């Protein structure tokens, strides 16, 4: 059949350009990526053949072969895996079926070192072939398909690609790289074997190369007989003592396609009523599309060394950054995704590895604060989801949280709840915190004034998830957690008798004017009262203890979500009795000015709090009216 010509989709063209021009220094990854693809294809066939043995076509000696030809200047990576149909070839090699591709491409800066890191986080897979090859030919036949229905794909990365139907005796895929002249040094046995041992030594499938012999003069002879050049014993089944740090790191890069080393790993063998091996990794950096809700995540599930699937059920969502492998002997080989969702063995494994991960993170936080801080900076926000999602581990997760505070000096989140408790003032039995849009807004919030004056530390929470998290984290280590922007604040135990008496007197003096302000503001406020929070600012707004903070209200409105009745939507206006503006209001006889100043005190407090102001122009006009 004659060949058909196709053009790459726009994103592929751009990615190919990046691969060719930005990843020259990382050329070695091409072999890792191709071997990884071949391994995946074999694992898929291994799984599919459990229910359909005919797919094996009487060939169950699964292997990946690497051949090179110095005369033809080619490297060929072939496998006897599942193979592809013509439609799959066009879909897999002509498009990028990866969400967030456009956003990724837009995020590139032009700085090669930064872009290389981003490209590494994205993963380039098959397209890495074009780092070392100026033309790539793919020959493939799907397992079970007629020999005459195989497919050939050819591209030079410049002018799209061609596809034609060919005859291929054996199932599987072979990728033929026509090596660029500047990379001809790759056409050596010891070079290719070295790359296999460096990047793919621990994969489950034998990687084979033709034997090479040397005579006494060092002349090389390539034999027709193949030998296995990798250690085929799965790394997760080996003893920890047998595995080097380099092997752990290379296996991480193999399964994650990350350029950077893993931050840490957890290698575990469990025996007894429940038997499984696990090798889990925590990356250094979150991938560029980490917050994409449609992105797949999960651990690779094996049953007695047979790959089954990437499975979300093995991890709670708040640990979705963890990479790795679980190999269980307690599941059937023909297990389906639907069965896994309601499987007691999976539930037990999930519970056990969740406990193990949290335990290892706790150890890391204790033994290596700098390393833990790197973890927190990358994945702290997603770990916070666990406080609300995982009640049984809430206290453990809370112990891993880190925050900025009024005493930490900057926006870096370094303070644990245990740190906070260790330096609480004598007589303090409450952990105080404030939520806000940003560190500066939180650190300069007027409601901190009394706390700063009394030397009471306040946690500054500025992540979008914090308000939601704190709705379930009401105490830690026996200490009540209290938002300083909700309800009344009782700091009387830190007050002098003179100040207590003074506040009681001011409350009586302002009783009449507070009622008048409330009448002026009508349904805009729930109440008006004197503040124990303020020392310098004239006013602030709070909500009742069980109401939704103004910060949360704003976020929900921005997300297009409505409010349930009775959630305490109206703010409480608090006034500083000693402030000149409040004193002026108290003594103001002109009803128009009294009403304007009352409105102004409310609106400026709402503005400082980051709350939604219904009519910003009216606020500006009111301010301008009293600027002298």
Swiss-Prot record:
It comes from Francisella tularensis subsp. novicida (strain U112). It is found in: Cytoplasm. It comes from the Bacteria. InterPro entries: HATPase_C_sf, Heat_shock_protein_90_CS, HSP90_C, Hsp90_fam, Hsp90_N, Ribosomal_Su5_D2-typ_SF. CDD domains: HATPase_Hsp90-like. Molecular chaperone. Has ATPase activity. GO terms for cellular component: cytoplasm. This is Chaperone protein HtpG. PROSITE patterns: HSP90. Homodimer. PANTHER family: HEAT SHOCK PROTEIN 90 FAMILY MEMBER. GO terms for molecular function: ATP binding; ATP hydrolysis activity; ATP-dependent protein folding chaperone; unfolded protein binding. Keywords: ATP-binding, Chaperone, Cytoplasm, Nucleotide-binding, Stress response. Residues 555-628 are annotated as: C. Its main location: cytoplasm.
């Amino acid at each position: 059949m004659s060949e058909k010509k196709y053009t790459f989709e726009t994103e592929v063209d751009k990615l190919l350009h990046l691969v060719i021009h930005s990843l020259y220094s990382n050329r070695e990854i091409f072999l890792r990526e191709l071997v990884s693809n071949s391994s995946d294809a074999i694992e898929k066939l291994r799984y599919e053949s459990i229910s359909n043995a005919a797919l094996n076509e009487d060939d169950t000696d699964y292997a990946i072969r690497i051949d090179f030809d110095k005369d033809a200047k080619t490297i060929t990576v072939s496998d006897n895996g599942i193979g592809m149909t013509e439609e799959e070839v066009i879909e897999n090699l002509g498009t990028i079926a990866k969400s967030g591709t456009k956003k990724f491409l837009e995020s590139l800066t032009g700085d090669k070192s930064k872009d290389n890191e981003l490209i590494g986080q994205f993963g380039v897979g098959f397209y890495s072939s074009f780092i070392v090859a100026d033309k790539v030919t793919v020959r493939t036949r799907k397992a079970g398909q007629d020999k005459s229905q195989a497919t050939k794909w050819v591209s030079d990365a410049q002018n799209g690609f061609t596809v034609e139907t060919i005859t291929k005796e054996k199932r599987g895929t072979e990728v033929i790289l026509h090596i660029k002249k500047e990379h001809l040094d790759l056409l050596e046995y010891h070079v290719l074997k070295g790359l296999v041992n460096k990047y793919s030594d621990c994969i489950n499938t034998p990687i084979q190369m033709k034997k090479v012999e040397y005579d006494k003069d060092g002349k090389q002879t390539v034999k027709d007989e193949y030998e296995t050049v990798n250690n085929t014993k799965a790394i997760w089944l080996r003893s920890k003592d047998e595995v080097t740090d380099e092997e752990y790191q290379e296996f991480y890069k193999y399964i994650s396609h990350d350029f950077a080393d893993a931050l840490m790993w957890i290698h575990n063998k469990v025996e007894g009523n429940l038997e499984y091996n696990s090798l889990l990794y925590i990356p250094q950096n979150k991938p560029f599309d980490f917050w994409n809700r449609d992105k797949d995540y999960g651990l690779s599930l094996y049953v007695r060394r047979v790959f089954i699937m990437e499975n979300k059920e093995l991890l709670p969502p708040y640990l979705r950054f963890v990479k790795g492998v679980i190999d269980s002997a307690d599941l059937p080989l023909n297990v389906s995704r639907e069965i896994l969702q309601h499987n007691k063995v999976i539930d037990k494994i999930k519970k056990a590895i969740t406990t193990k991960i949290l335990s290892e993170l706790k150890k890391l936080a204790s033994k290596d604060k700098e390393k833990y801080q790197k973890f927190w900076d990358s994945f702290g926000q997603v770990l916070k989801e666990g406080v609300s999602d995982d009640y049984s581990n809430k206290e453990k997760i809370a112990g891993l949280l880190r925050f900025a505070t009024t005493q930490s000096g900057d926006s870096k989140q370094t303070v644990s709840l245990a740190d906070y408790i260790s330096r609480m003032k004598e007589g303090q039995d409450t952990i105080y915190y404030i939520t806000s849009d940003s560190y500066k807004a939180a650190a300069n919030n007027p409601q901190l004034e009394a706390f700063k004056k009394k030397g009471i530390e306040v946690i500054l929470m500025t992540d979008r998830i914090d308000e939601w998290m704190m709705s379930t984290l009401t105490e830690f280590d026996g200490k009540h957690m209290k938002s300083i922007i909700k309800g009344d604040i009782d700091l009387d135990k830190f007050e002098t008798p003179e100040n207590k008496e003074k506040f009681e007197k001011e409350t009586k003096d302002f009783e009449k004017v507070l009622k008048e302000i409330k009448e002026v503001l009508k349904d805009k406020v729930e109440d008006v009262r004197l503040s124990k929070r303020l020392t310098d600012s004239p006013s602030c707004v709070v909500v009742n203890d069980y109401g939704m903070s103004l910060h949360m209200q704003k976020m929900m409105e921005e997300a297009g979500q409505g409010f349930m009745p009775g959630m305490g939507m109206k703010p409480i206006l608090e006034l500083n009795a000693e402030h000149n503006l409040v004193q002026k209001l108290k003594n103001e006889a002109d009803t128009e000015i009294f009403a304007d100043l009352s409105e102004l005190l409310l609106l400026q407090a709402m503005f400082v709090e980051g709350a939604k102001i219904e009519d910003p122009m009216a606020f500006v006009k009111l301010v301008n009216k009293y600027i002298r």
